Curated annotation (Swiss-Prot):
It comes from the Archaea. InterPro entries: SfsA, SfsA_C, SfsA_N. This is Sugar fermentation stimulation protein homolog. Pfam families: SfsA, SfsA_N. The lineage of its organism: Archaea, Methanobacteriati, Thermoplasmatota, Thermoplasmata, Thermoplasmatales. Disulfide bonds: none annotated.
């Protein structure tokens, strides 16, 4: 039995209240963005490991939510890529992915030297997110990800222990029509991805779109045929 359940187009996976429009002034470091809100300069936490060059740059539009952080009172939630808004907060990925799984899963399952996002029966499921789309191709990663490559190797090795591994991509960009690993940004991940898929790691690619303050399921896509 598949570990996944089907959702229809337009299924709402997450909704936020009272998001705040902002404009980026600068990216202070990997996790902090300086921005303007109603002519006031504020600092916001960016909980996204990606490089995000296409989204986080001076003058671009983002949406923030109020938080009770120790250092910052705002968190970046959505960023605009020139076409549409994308989700840029990794804290919500697991919750969104879980809405496409049958009941009975375990979160943060420890296997070998890693924690895999989900275990469901014999299925190991690792979740990654993607916002970069070029020529209708969803591309991951947007920066070198040693952690992502390591997870692929762990999934591949799990087959010999009787597991059925999946890598699941949540693509928060409705322009995506197919998926390809981003060889230009990370050739090691790309090569490992193709090797893993060829040798028994299954893949799943779910596309989402954002309207107002809510995220909806759009469609499932396949790998690009180059």
């Amino acid at each position: 039995m598949s570990p996944f359940i089907k959702r229809g187009h337009g299924f709402m996976v997450l909704s936020f209240e009272n998001l705040i429009d902002a404009v980026i002034v600068s990216r202070i470091n990997r996790f902090v963005v300086k921005c303007m809100v109603n002519n006031e300069e504020v600092y916001a936490h960016l909980h996204d490991p990606g490089r995000l060059n296409e989204i986080i740059y001076p003058g671009n539009k983002i949406k923030l939510r109020k938080t009770d952080g120790k250092k910052y009172n705002y968190s970046v939630t959505f960023g605009h890529d020139g076409f549409n808004y994308t989700l840029n907060d990794a804290r919500f990925h697991s919750m969104i992915a879980s809405q496409f799984l049958r009941l009975g899963f375990k979160k943060e399952y420890k296997y070998m030297d890693s924690r895999i996002d989900f275990l469901l029966d014999e299925y190991l499921i690792e979740v990654k997110s993607c916002t970069l789309v070029n020529s209708k191709k969803a591309m991951f990663p947007d920066a070198v990800t040693r952690r992502g490559t390591h997870h692929l190797n762990v999934l591949l090795n799990s087959i010999q222990d009787g597991y059925r591994p999946y890598i699941m991509f949540l693509i928060f960009n409705e322009r995506a029509e197919c998926f390809t690993p981003n060889k230009c940004r990370d050739p090691e991940f790309s090569g490992t991805f193709y090797r893993a898929v060829k040798n028994g790691v299954s893949s799943k690619f779910l596309v989402f779109y954002i309207r107002e303050n809510s995220i909806y399921f759009d469609k499932e896509i396949s790998m690009c045929v180059d």
